[in-house]
Amino acid sequence: MARMHARRRGIASSVRPYRKEVPAWSNSDVKEIEGKIVELRKAGLTCAQIGLVLRDKHGVPNVKLATGKRINAIVRENDLDTDIPEDLRNLMHKALMMRKHLEQNRKDLHNKRQLQLTEAKVRRLVKYYVGTKRLPLGWVYKPETAEILLSR
């Protein structure tokens, strides 16, 4: 498959092993896993960080295989979800850091272009989340207010 902003093929990467059932060696107690997810979320970890902690420290290679639900779904069920989805928040943070870099390095043309591409991704993602009702209907990405939104 081609890359998003380049007209060439991507590079190969590792693939997660195909499994339909939980490995015998893993921790597969559903209540314990869900409780750990809620506890880690209340401690301030993102869903991606929760997955890494469960994999590395608690022997849960795949939460969806063990519980039948994704980490995000478990977080939403317990009303611990943030107002801005995690992937959108990460892209907005990336764009904000690029803007701060460009304030000091105005002639950095490569970064200017990368900022345009990143903000285009943000706008596409906002359009998707407004359509799926994860964001309110009139929600629009504005670079001026992004820092205030991310500080919450």
Curated annotation (Swiss-Prot):
Keywords: Ribonucleoprotein, Ribosomal protein. The keyword Magnesium does not apply. One of its GO terms (molecular function) is structural constituent of ribosome. GO terms for biological process: translation. InterPro entries: Ribosomal_uS15, Ribosomal_uS15_arc_euk, Ribosomal_uS15_N, uS15_NS1_RNA-bd_sf. SMART domains: Ribosomal_S13_N (SM01386), Ribosomal_S15 (SM01387). Gene3D superfamilies: 4.10.860.130, S15/NS1, RNA-binding. One of its GO terms (cellular component) is cytosolic small ribosomal subunit. Belongs to the universal ribosomal protein uS15 family. Part of the 30S ribosomal subunit. This is Small ribosomal subunit protein uS15.
